[in-house]
């Protein structure tokens, strides 16, 4: 699916943007703090209904405005569709071809074909940072693979909050009543993540070998569930094992007022040659591993959807060494995908630019075309 046109109104620092992107590569140039990342976030928000960065929805609205809006025309096998989302302090409202979700349009229809993958400098810290970032990666990748994950995750968060509140203040029977919905929703997420990791692992291994060469150690990817829950079983058995872990930890959880087992406590393990990459990988190896993980995600979606996702790359080239940057740009040039890239330095992108690459300057929230 290709983005034909983009309209942004009062989103972050973008007052009014009308953009006709290239069907292949659109490059946004400008100094830091001018709005390049905000434009990528507008596209990401449109295609996922979630902010790219962890903020309150009110922070997406330009200062002084009551609401922000993003709309885009997407061309796919079924023709052209217009998707739009308005955001304000009170929430967001999405529409598909002018029909609001829930009253004429379904969430599944809205997300059909709207897969987008973002790659930012923060992702390069995925290996050495804490598990929160790796869980966010898993959740975003799972959402792209199965959009129903959005509703499943919301169900889990509701159940988790209810059980945590009961652990802190409620009688035993109240906690027990919230445990079953938590187990049901948690097992569904565990199985989704397990299946996703199984799909990504061989692609990660192949991409890392291609980036790093035949002498590099073998890359591995695994899912580690908290509380010793073994996820390599059918969903009903995973649910039973999660329930057992929660029962075994009940007294500890009561003391802390917090649920200590479940998807919100799990981790994604990345290893090189059988050793944890976080502790034993060099910075260069860690960055190559993250690059390989992103390529694995893209290729997995390409296989599942029959086409590559929309790509959003936020100043990644400036954070990679020349060899890895050449690999990334070469990969993008060969991939039949629509990509949006930001950079403060045109020279980092230009070697891979094709005749259909469109360059724009972003300055103080204003987006202007540049001569290619």
From Swiss-Prot:
<dbReference type="GO" id="GO:0006260">
    <property type="term" value="P:DNA replication"/>
</dbReference>
<keyword id="KW-0547">Nucleotide-binding</keyword>
<protein>
    <recommendedName>
        <fullName>DNA replication and repair protein RecF</fullName>
    </recommendedName>
</protein>
<dbReference type="Pfam" id="PF02463">
    <property type="entry name" value="SMC_N"/>
</dbReference>
<dbReference type="InterPro" id="IPR001238">
    <property type="entry name" value="DNA-binding_RecF"/>
</dbReference>
<dbReference type="GO" id="GO:0000731">
    <property type="term" value="P:DNA synthesis involved in DNA repair"/>
</dbReference>
<keyword id="KW-0235">DNA replication</keyword>
<keyword id="KW-0234">DNA repair</keyword>
<dbReference type="InterPro" id="IPR042174">
    <property type="entry name" value="RecF_2"/>
</dbReference>
<dbReference type="InterPro" id="IPR003395">
    <property type="entry name" value="RecF/RecN/SMC_N"/>
</dbReference>
<keyword id="KW-0227">DNA damage</keyword>
<keyword id="KW-0742">SOS response</keyword>
<dbReference type="GO" id="GO:0009432">
    <property type="term" value="P:SOS response"/>
</dbReference>
<dbReference type="GO" id="GO:0005524">
    <property type="term" value="F:ATP binding"/>
</dbReference>
<dbReference type="InterPro" id="IPR018078">
    <property type="entry name" value="DNA-binding_RecF_CS"/>
</dbReference>
<dbReference type="GO" id="GO:0005737">
    <property type="term" value="C:cytoplasm"/>
</dbReference>
<comment type="function">
    <text>The RecF protein is involved in DNA metabolism; it is required for DNA replication and normal SOS inducibility. RecF binds preferentially to single-stranded, linear DNA. It also seems to bind ATP.</text>
</comment>
<feature type="binding site">
    <location>
        <begin position="30"/>
        <end position="37"/>
    </location>
    <ligand>
        <name>ATP</name>
    </ligand>
</feature>
<keyword id="KW-0067">ATP-binding</keyword>
<dbReference type="GO" id="GO:0006302">
    <property type="term" value="P:double-strand break repair"/>
</dbReference>
<dbReference type="InterPro" id="IPR027417">
    <property type="entry name" value="P-loop_NTPase"/>
</dbReference>
<dbReference type="GO" id="GO:0003697">
    <property type="term" value="F:single-stranded DNA binding"/>
</dbReference>
<keyword id="KW-0963">Cytoplasm</keyword>
<keyword id="KW-0238">DNA-binding</keyword>
<comment type="similarity">
    <text>Belongs to the RecF family.</text>
</comment>
């Amino acid at each position: 699916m290709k983005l034909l046109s983009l309209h942004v109104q009062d989103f972050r620092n973008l007052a009014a943007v009308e953009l006709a992107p290239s069907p292949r590569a659109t490059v946004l140039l400008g100094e830091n703090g001018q709005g390049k990342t905000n434009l990528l976030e507008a596209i990401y928000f449109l295609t996922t209904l979630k902010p790219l960065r962890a903020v309150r929805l009110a922070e997406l609205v330009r200062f002084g405005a009551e609401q922000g809006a993003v709309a885009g025309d997407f061309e796919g096998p079924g023709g052209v569709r217009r998707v739009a989302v308005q955001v304000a302090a009170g929430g967001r409202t999405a529409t598909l071809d002018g029909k609001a979700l829930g009253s004429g349009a379904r969430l599944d229809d809205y997300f059909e074909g709207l897969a987008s993958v973002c790659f930012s400098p923060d992702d390069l810290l995925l290996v050495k940072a804490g598990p929160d970032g790796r869980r966010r990666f898993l959740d975003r990748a799972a959402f792209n693979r199965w959009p129903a994950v959005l509703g499943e995750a919301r169900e889990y968060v509701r159940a988790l909050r209810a059980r945590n509140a009961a652990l802190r203040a409620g009688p035993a029977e109240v906690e027990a009543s919230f445990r079953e919905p938590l187990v049901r929703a948690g097992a569904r997420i565990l199985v989704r993540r397990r299946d996703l990791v199984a799909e990504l692992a061989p692609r990660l291994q192949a991409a890392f070998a291609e980036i790093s060469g035949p002498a590099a150690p073998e890359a591995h990817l695994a899912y580690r569930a908290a509380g010793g829950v073994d996820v390599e079983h059918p969903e009903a058995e995973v649910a039973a094992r999660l329930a057992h872990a929660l029962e075994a930890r009940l007294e500890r959880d009561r003391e802390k007022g917090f649920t200590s087992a479940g998807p919100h406590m799990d981790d994604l393990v990345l290893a090189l040659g059988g050793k944890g990459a976080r502790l034993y990988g060099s910075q260069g190896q860690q960055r190559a591993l993250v690059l390989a993980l992103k390529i694995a995600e893209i290729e997995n979606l390409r296989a599942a959807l029959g086409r590559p996702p929309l790509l959003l790359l936020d100043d990644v080239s400036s954070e990679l060494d020349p060899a890895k940057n050449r690999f990334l740009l070469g990969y993008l040039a060969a991939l039949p995908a629509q990509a949006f890239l930001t950079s403060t330095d045109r020279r980092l992108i230009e070697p891979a630019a094709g005749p259909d690459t469109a360059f724009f300057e972003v300055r103080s929230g204003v987006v202007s075309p540049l001569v290619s």
